[in-house]
From Swiss-Prot:
One of its GO terms (cellular component) is cytoplasm. It is found in: Cytoplasm. The gene is NBPF3. This is NBPF family member NBPF3. Residues 221-313, 314-402, 405-460, 461-552, 555-633 form the Olduvai domain. Its main location: cytoplasm. Transmembrane segments: none annotated. Expressed in testis and fetal heart, as well as in non small cell lung carcinoma and neuroblastoma cell line. The keyword Coiled coil applies. Residues 127-186 form a coiled coil.
């Protein structure tokens, strides 16, 4: 079957033996004729599976168409050759493109495989690193959280400590502020003349000086090694202390004798003011007034004076028992004390002061100060007593009657009596218990008590009693101003008048208490004293002069055995008699009720009459002042 290639849409069919092929693949028709149909295959058209060009022509064999057909073939060949060349060139280009495409595909395929493996490894490594990094970050965060928790606990503890320190610091600041305020209120003077700080500094300086002086006096070698300069200084001090006393001696001559005799048997009581006069504070103590009370000291030996000073505190349990029993009369109280005390120490007990064991709470802060000041004042009292002792001895040389001297006491009195007298004379009185509310008047109350607590008995009347006792027997001592006077030598009488009838100096009132000066002076001059029933005592004395019995002592045994009813009534009346109410100054009216209540409730009198001693005991609560003066035979 002949091939029928198709070239550019034409189909040529070659039949017969006349068909020839040209060297270029073009068919050639036989000379004898060409067929009607020719098949030509374009050699430039590539086949799908072969690179050769087959041209088939179908030429119908005919005589008239041979030449024409040949010419057409040649023309076609000529026209087909450039096209064939173009097709070949396109084929080459397509082949090259196909090779390039295959190479690109291969390369792309290889590249994809390589990139995937590398990326996979890279991704795995990155994921592993990221997981490790995450774990490290988590561990680090946990460690930081733990450290933060520890730091938080430490911060809380430090904050608590800081809070406590702040509280302590605030407390310290408050305490410091209160201390500064207290010191400023204590030491800063509100007024030049009324300052607690100034008073305290003065008291401190005076206390130091008195303490040094007391140490010098109490030293054992003081009597042997005392310098002349010290003696001169003591003499100057005594002269300075008694300079105001000499001025008052001239003034006392104008005082009526009745007022002097009234002062001789009276004792001023320091009253306990009410708490309404509280908001003042002044603890100034007048040392000069304390020294005046000890001017009756009669001694020549320093050791004897040391033995004479005795301050015995009362037993607190005894006071509690007395309070449980209820109010006891002063005489019964004194009789119970006489039962407990031996007869040997009776005189010593009479002259011994009692210190109250139970003081008010407001006075506790000042108690040690008063006691120390009192102990320091004893030394000055010793010097004053020695000076007056020398003066008394000089007057005794000129006197013709018995005097209160150590020679007379050595001749007629036992040693116990002398020691008891010295103990009484040299013992300063205790300070009264005053609350802090009455500070501006404390020094004045003390000065009133310290100046007027004593008995200034007129010895000319005592001399008269002695003469009557020698003639008629030993009657009881007369305490009346109506006793007849005895002729005494002028020098003795003058000395006695100067000694015993001299009123004490008025207290130096501070500036804060000046409006009440007249009130205190009226207390001293007119209204303080004991109401003694003189008529009953005189009746009893007249009866005793007829019977001539010995003077009974007011102790438990003699009172029950020999005391008559008249004396008992007079003594009871004396015990129960209180002092006259005071006519207070108008500016001091608000404190009147306190003085009255104090006098009505707390003051009781005990009278102990003996042939040698007259004891006046003032009992206020648990504070008893016992005093005595010798009655010479």
């Amino acid at each position: 079957m002949p091939l029928t290639p198709t070239v550019q849409g034409f189909q040529w069919t070659l039949r017969g033996p006349d068909v020839e092929t040209s060297p270029f693949g073009a068919p050639r028709a036989a000379s004898h004729g060409v067929g009607r149909h020719q098949e030509l295959r374009d050699p430039t058209v590539p086949g799908p599976t072969s690179s050769a060009t087959n041209v088939s022509m179908v030429v119908s064999a005919g005589p008239w168409s041979g030449e024409k057909a040949e010419m057409n073939i040649l023309e076609i060949n000529k026209k087909s050759r450039p096209q064939l060349a173009e097709n070949k060139q396109q084929f080459r280009n397509l082949k090259q493109k196909c090779l390039v495409t295959q190479v690109a595909y291969f390369l792309a395929n290889r590249q994809n495989n390589y990139d995937y493996e590398d990326c996979k490894d890279l991704i795995k490594s990155m994921l592993r690193d990221e997981r490790l990094l995450t774990e490290e970050k988590l561990a680090e965060e946990l460690g930081q959280a733990e450290e933060l928790r520890q730091y938080k606990v430490l911060v809380h503890s430090q904050e608590r400590e800081l809070t406590q320190l702040r509280e302590k610091l605030q407390e310290g600041r408050d305490a410091s502020r209160s201390l500064n305020q207290h010191l400023q209120a204590l030491l800063t003077p509100d007024e030049p003349d009324n300052s607690q700080g100034r008073d305290l500094r003065e008291q401190l300086a005076e206390g130091c000086r008195l303490a040094q002086h007391l140490v010098q006096k109490l030293s054992p070698e003081n009597d042997d090694d005392e310098d002349e300069d010290v003696k001169v200084e003591e003499a100057e001090k005594v002269q300075e202390l008694y300079a105001p006393r000499e001025v008052q001696k001239a003034e006392e001559k104008e005082v009526p004798e009745d007022s002097l005799e009234e002062c001789a048997i009276t004792c001023s009581n320091s009253h306990h003011p009410c708490e309404s006069n509280q908001p003042y504070g002044n603890t100034r103590i007048t040392f000069e007034e304390d020294q005046v009370d000890s001017t009756l000291i009669d001694s020549s030996s320093h050791d004897e004076w040391l033995d004479a000073v005795c301050i015995i505190p009362e037993n607190e349990s005894d006071h509690e028992q007395e309070e449980e029993k209820g109010p006891v009369s002063p005489r019964n109280l004194q009789e119970s004390e006489e039962e407990e005390a031996p007869q040997e120490s009776w005189d010593e007990g009479d002259w011994t002061l009692s210190i109250p064991p139970d003081m008010s709470a407001s006075y506790q802060s000042d108690r040690s100060t008063f006691h120390s000041v009192e102990e320091q004042q004893v030394g000055l009292a010793l010097d004053i007593g020695r000076h007056w002792c020398d003066q008394v001895k000089k007057e005794d040389q000129e006197a013709t009657s018995p005097r209160l001297s150590r020679e007379l006491l050595d001749e007629k009195e036992p040693e116990v009596l002398q020691d008891s007298l010295d103990r009484f004379y040299s013992t300063p009185f205790e300070y009264l218990e005053l609350p802090d509310l009455c500070q501006p008047y404390r020094s004045d109350f003390y000065s009133l008590q310290e100046q007027h607590l004593g008995l200034a008995l007129d010895l000319d009347r005592m001399k008269k009693d002695q003469e009557e006792e020698e003639d008629q027997g030993p009657p009881c001592p007369r305490l009346s101003r109506e006793l007849p006077e005895v002729v005494e030598p002028e020098d003795l009488q003058d000395s006695l008048d100067r000694w015993y009838s001299t009123p004490f100096s008025y207290p130096e009132l501070p500036d804060s208490c000046q409006p009440y000066g007249s009130c205190f002076y009226s207390l001293e001059e007119e209204h303080v004293g004991f109401s003694l029933d003189v008529d009953e005592i005189e009746k009893y004395q007249e009866g005793e002069e007829d019977q001539k019995p010995p003077c009974p002592r007011l102790n438990e045994v003699l009172m029950e055995a020999e005391e008559p009813e008249v004396l008992q009534d007079s003594l009871d009346r004396c015990y129960s008699t209180t002092s006259t109410y005071f006519q207070l100054h108008a500016s001091f009216q608000q404190y009147r009720s306190a003085f009255y209540s104090f006098e009505e409730q707390d003051v009781s009198l005990a009278l102990d009459v003996d042939n040698r001693f007259f004891t006046l005991t003032v009992i206020r609560h648990h504070l008893a002042f016992q005093m005595g003066v010798i009655f010479p035979h």
